[in-house]
Amino acid sequence: MSLADLTKTNIDEQFSSVALENNRRSAECKRSPGTGDFSRNSNASAKSVDYSRSQCSCGSLSSQYDYSEDFLCDCSEKAINRNYLKQPVVKEKEKKKYNVSKISQSKGQKEISVGKKHTWNASLFNSQIHMIAQRRDAMAHRILSARLHKIKGLKNELADMHHKLEAILTENQFLKQLQLRHLKAIGKYENSQNNLPQIMAKHQNEVKNLRQLLRKSQEKERTVSRKLRETDSQLLKTKDTLQALQKLSEDKNLAEREELTHKLSIITTKMEANDKKIQSLEKQLRLNSRAFSRQLAIETRKTLAAQTATKTLQVEVKHLQQKLKEKDRELEIKNIYSHRILKNLHDTEDYPKVSSTKSVQADRKSLPFTSMRHQGTQKSDVAPLTTKGKKATGNMDRKEKSTEINREIPHCVNKLPKQEDSKTKYEDLSREEKHLEVQVLLENTGRQKDKKEDQEKKTIFVKEEQELPPKIIEVIHPERESTQEDVLVREKFKRSMQRNGMDDTPDKCTAPYTKGPLRQRRHYSFTEATENLHHGLPASGGPANAGNTKYSHSTSKHLSNREEMELEHSDSGYEPSFGKSSRIKAKDTTFRDKKSSLMEELFGSGYVLKTDQSSPGVAKGSEEPLQSKESHPLPPSQASASNAFGDSKVTVVNSIKPSSPTEGKRKIII
């Protein structure tokens, strides 16, 4: 308010100074009317100077107190308005004075004419002053209004700034409150993080305590429930006893106590006897079940053994079938030309038909052997001479074992114990089981030995086949078979027959395999044209084929010598009673006659001459053909030619693991 008062006083002083100057100038004009223009100019200049001064003073005041104008209030505005109202009042007074002076001058015109002139000049001067004053007043009014307008704008800005300040202050207060709250929350969070392990430990302890309380409460509930059940059961029992006692008390037809006690004792004895019987029956059932389980186990073992035996037999059969197929293929590959010639010869009527089936070949090839019931004794005594005979005996022995097992199963089933004599029969069964187990062990050991021997023989057979050169058939003279081997074979055969008790009926258990006298091999000599045709050469052969013809003649000679030696050996060898040797001996002469006649018909008299030339070479001994065979092996073409009119196949049989060291490779040519 002090600044506003200062501004009011300054404005009043300015207006008062202006009014005083006007009065003084008017007085001066009255005093010096002659100098009107100069005074006017001077007054105007003074007034202009004063106005400039007033402006300067106002500017200085505004420059000095510019910061205080922003803080003017309504009271200062009211004071300024009052000053503006006072100014027209002063002007009206001046006008009245001017009018009064005019009136006074008009009254004194009559007296003083000079005075009239001065009044006229003064009135003009006053009118000019009045115009200048009005102009100044308008300028001042405009300046003041602009200044007031500025002041009002500044006041409005001040008010806006005050409002903004107030809003900012409130916002600051709210933000400070939020900051305090955030700080408090952050402090709590940090404290909670620091106190987390403690809180967790407290929580875990509380959980443990609660669980312990739960367990205790559950245990208490269980005990209470048990007690309740027990009490309920006791109550029911007591109720039942009460009802029974009430019934007894109500019954009037009761017997005496002695009779009742006697009846009770009898009933108790009967109950005890029944309990004992039940216990004894249970024991018997247990024993019977054990016996049955053991018997079932034994039978299952036997069945498993039989199944394994059948599987092994099936595998062996398949293996043998494969071997037979392979041998058939090899023979077909070797004897291509012989098959073609045989087809042509079978068509003729005079030629005796030859059946070259596998069964006939097996009968011809097989040497005498026996099929034994127990494999252990057979292996220790007899070593078979051929692979097929060995496998056939093994098959027969395994079949006999399977039949024995099938016979023993019903025998054991019939020996099941009854309820009366369970203990004694159980002991007998245990003994029988032990005996059967021993037999099974012996059979297993025998089978293992069989397998080992079979493997050894197979390895030896493979080695011997590998040692032999391909496409060469070695023929070893049968004189290498010593008489000792024949004696050993006879003794072993007799022992086996005595052990098995099969002397009376050998046809039932043993297969009648016989070694009859070997058939004579048919050897034919051909002309050069036919031999060349067999070899695939042209019929008209030159001197180059002479060596082959000589070679064929020599081989035919050796073969004829060998056949004669075989016939001699077969006459001196062992021949069983159930063989067919006598029939073959009777047919030898007729067969030779037929052969000679047939060859004459086919090839003419040249073949007979060649056979006559080759006959004296037989007396040279049995060693020459062996040496010639070893030094000159048969070529495959010559072998096929020699087999053309004989048997269709040449089979080579190696003895597997011979019984004596002198026994070597044995080959039978059919």
UniProtKB/Swiss-Prot annotation:
Positions with biased composition (Polar residues): 368-380, 546-558, 637-647
Keywords, comma-separated and alphabetical: Coiled coil
KW Coiled coil (keyword) present: yes
Keyword Coiled coil tagged: yes
Positions of region (Disordered): 24-44, 351-402, 495-520, 533-594, 606-647
GO biological process: intraciliary transport
Start-end of Basic and acidic residues biased regions: 560-572, 585-594, 621-632
Stored InterPro entries: Lebercilin-like, Lebercilin_dom
Record field: transmembrane: none
One Gene Ontology term, aspect cellular component: axoneme
Domain of life (superkingdom): Eukaryota
Stretches assigned to coiled coil: 148-259, 305-336, 420-440
Family membership: Belongs to the LCA5 family.
Record's protein name: Lebercilin-like protein
